[in-house]
Every structure is written in structure tokens, then in C-alpha cells.
A protein has these predicted regions:
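A polyanion-binding, active-site-adjacent surface
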Residues: 2, 6, 14-162, 166-169, ...
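Short, conserved glycine- and acidic-residue-centered signature motifs
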Residues: 198
Length: 222
């Protein structure tokens, strides 16, 4: 099944055949006809299409897509350019500036990170308009857990950045000692002062990659 268009299709072929995934596809196809669902249908698997399995150096986990009009663009924490920056993304940029002295961007599109090898993966891949977490029990987490497990199997070292309790739950899936796990509180305004600010995830990521002779990430938002 060619859903993504790169090596992820072969890696996830077994998941595509499972009943839970077939049920998601059936539900989603109907739901998009009946009511506003985000992200755009052709962007549901965009994080995977932009960052091939073999190119994944870093994984940043999000929850579910933004639920406002025109916001979600298939990448965790990212919004389309021209959309007001969500508070969590503003705080990510503040920490990036503090950590690597990268200027705070006015652009919200993180496609440039995805092309650098950062998989910006939401654990739930769709949401109803103005109803956060409305698709939480649809089965998406079975699929995204499988993605995390497949990355865990990689021989090449990978950095997993887990922000907030929902992301830290996934730590149990990351068992390969070659990988680095960076944890902190979520960049949301409600929790950013409880460990996110000052956690220096970006410099720690690049230090680890460099130590393993892997090209560092350019976190500049272009």
C-alpha cells in the first residue's frame, strides 16, 4: 500500500493490514465528508512523507493537530505561515533562542526542520474542528506507537524529545540504548516554567548527534 511514498510504506505495511488501521481509514473517509476535520486529508501522514525512515535523526512528539481553521499542516507544533503563532510554539522559539541564539522566527511552518531529519509526530493524527482530543480514542496511537517502535529499532542513534506527560508515557517504547531521550515539561504556557525553559533540548540534541558522527540539525526556521 503506497500511502506515504517513501520507505515508510514498506516499514508500516504490516500496520496497514491490521483491523484497527482499516477501521481508522473507513471512519476518516466518512468523517471528512460530514464535518470539518483537521489537518487536511492529504496532510495526515505528511510528517512521514517529509522525513523518510532512513533520514530520521530526531523525533519530537506532539499530541493531536491544532483544531482551528487553517492551522494544522501535518507536523507537530507547526502551523502554516501567516497563522498566528500558538503559545507553545512561541515558547519553543524562546527556548531555541536562549539555547542556540537562533533569532525568534515570526514563521510557524517547521517544514525546514522536517527536511533536516526531525520527525514532528503527533501521537493522534486528526481532530474535529474546535474539539481538541476528539479523535483520541480512534486508534491513531496504535499506529504512532508502531512508528516509535520502528524508529527504536534503528541502528543509527536517534534523539527522542519528549515534552509533557503525554509524551513521556511513550518512553517505555524507547528501549534501544543507542538512542538519547530528552525529557522536560511541555512548552505550553501552563507548564513551560516547570522545566521546559532552560532544558536546552536543541544544543543537547546536536551535541549527541555530533558525538555520534551524525550531521547536526540546523534549527533555524527558514
Amino acid at each position: 500500500m503506497n500511502l506515504i511514498g517513501n520507505s515508510w510504506d514498506n516499514i508500516l505495511e504490516e500496520e496497514y493490514q491490521k483491523d484497527y488501521f482499516k477501521k481508522i481509514v473507513l471512519y476518516i473517509n466518512e468523517a471528512y465528508k460530514e464535518r470539518p476535520i483537521y489537518q487536511p486529508k492529504n496532510y495526515i501522514l505528511r510528517a512521514l512523507s517529509l522525513t523518510d525512515y532512513n533520514e530520521v535523526k530526531v523525533v519530537i512528539l506532539g499530541q493531536d493537530p491544532y483544531h482551528g481553521v487553517g492551522e494544522a499542516n501535518g507536523l507537530a507544533f507547526s502551523v502554516n505561515n501567516g497563522i498566528k503563532l500558538p503559545p507553545s510554539l512561541q515558547n519553543i522559539y524562546k527556548e531555541l533562542n536562549s539555547d542556540l541564539n537562533i533569532p525568534i522566527s515570526t514563521k510557524g511552518d517547521l517544514t525546514c526542520w522536517a527536511k533536516e531529519g526531525v520527525l514532528l509526530l503527533n501521537t493522534v493524527l486528526t481532530v474535529e474542528k474546535d474539539r481538541p482530543a476528539s479523535h483520541k480514542n480512534l486508534g491513531w496511537e496504535n499506529f504512532t506507537d508502531a512508528i516509535i517502535k520502528k524508529i527504536n529499532e534503528k541502528d543509527a542513534p536517534v534523539v527522542f524529545i519528549l515534552w509533557g506527560n503525554f509524551a513521556k508515557i511513550k518512553k517505555s517504547l524507547i528501549t534501544n540504548p543507542k538512542h538519547l531521550i530528552i525529557e522536560s515539561s511541555h512548552p505550553s504556557p501552563f507548564s513551560c516554567n516547570y522545566g521546559f525553559f532552560g532544558s536546552r533540548p536543541f544544543s543537547r540534541t546536536n551535541k549527541f548527534l555530533k558525538e555520534n558522527n551524525i550531521k547536526e540539525i540546523d534549527f533555524t526556521v527558514k
